[in-house]
Each structure stands twice: as C-alpha cells, then as structure tokens.
C-alpha cells in the first residue's frame, strides 16, 4: 500500500515542488508584482497610482502567496476526489495511475492562470485608505492546512480476480 500511495503521490510531489519554487521566488523579490503587472497591467498600474510602490509590492506578494496556497489546497481536494473513484477505471480497462496522472496534469496546467486571476482579484479587492493597502485582509486568505491520504487503485481486483469471485459465488449458491 505504501508503494502504491507513493506512485500516486509522485506527480503531486513534482507539482508541489514547482509551486514551492514559484512561491519562494515571489516572496524574495519583486517577482510577485512583476507577474501580476504582466497578467493585468492596467489594473495593477491603476492601483499603483493609489498606493506606494513598496505597499503595492508587499500587497502583490501577499495576494500571490495566498492565491498559490488556496489553489494548491483546491488542487489537493480535486486529487482526493479523483482518487476516491479511480479504482473504477479498471472496469473500463484503463490503468488507474495513468488516468490519474492525465487528469491531474490537465488540472495543474490551468492552475497558473487561476492563481494569477485570484491574486489580481484579491489585490484589487483589498481596501485602500490614505494611500495604503489593508495588507491584513490579504493575509487572511491564506489557508491554514493541507492533508495527506493513502489509496488503492484496484480495490475491485483485476479481471481474473473478479471472475474468480463471481465463480465462487455461483458455485457456493449451487451447493
């Protein structure tokens, strides 16, 4: 069971490592503001006229980190939902691990755009008073926990196991 859980977790580990790298880069410098300004130039420029550069940079940093964390939590939730029924793919003669990786790969590809959209929205929704952003409202968007789980991808058994069970039930019924 550990080996199987490891196999399913490997894709998520690689995705997490990439997001952690992006997150750390955004925390260390002006990368967060650059990303948001590239994604929504007019909106970020307009906000920049209302608040100072340092304030905008810190707000972009907090908004992007909160969006990354929320998106990752949602991504893990999607993975958990997918894992709940992945064993049923065996009935369609599909490899559950391959199908899991396909679906989670597609989901991850859309994550970057959603993160930027959410971060820009959070930054623009933050209250501005006296040329300052309410940075505390941005920090409250950061999720406080994630979770881990184990899974089996073939709890119904392979074709021969299912046929054997059916045969045993049939023979037991005739005795």
Question: Which stretches of residues belong to each language-model region?
Answer:
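Extended, charged helical/alpha-beta scaffold domains that provide interaction surfaces
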Residues: 1-175
């Amino acid at each position: 069971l550990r080996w199987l859980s490891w196999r399913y977790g490997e894709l998520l580990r690689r995705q997490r490592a990439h997001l952690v790298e992006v997150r750390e880069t955004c925390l260390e410098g002006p990368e967060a503001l650059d990303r948001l300004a590239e994604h929504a130039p007019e909106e970020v420029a307009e906000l920049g006229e209302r608040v100072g550069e340092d304030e905008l940079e810190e707000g972009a940093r907090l908004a992007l980190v909160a969006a990354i964390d929320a998106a990752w939590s949602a991504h893990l939730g999607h993975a958990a939902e997918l894992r709940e029924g992945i064993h049923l793919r065996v009935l369609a003669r599909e490899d559950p691990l391959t199908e899991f990786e396909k679906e989670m790969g597609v989901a991850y590809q859309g994550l970057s755009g959603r993160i930027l959209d959410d971060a820009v929205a959070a930054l623009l929704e933050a209250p501005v008073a006296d040329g300052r952003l309410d940075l505390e409202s941005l920090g409250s968007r950061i999720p406080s926990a994630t979770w881990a789980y184990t899974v089996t991808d073939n709890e119904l058994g392979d074709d021969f196991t299912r046929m054997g069970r059916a045969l045993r039930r049939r023979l037991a019924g005739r005795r």
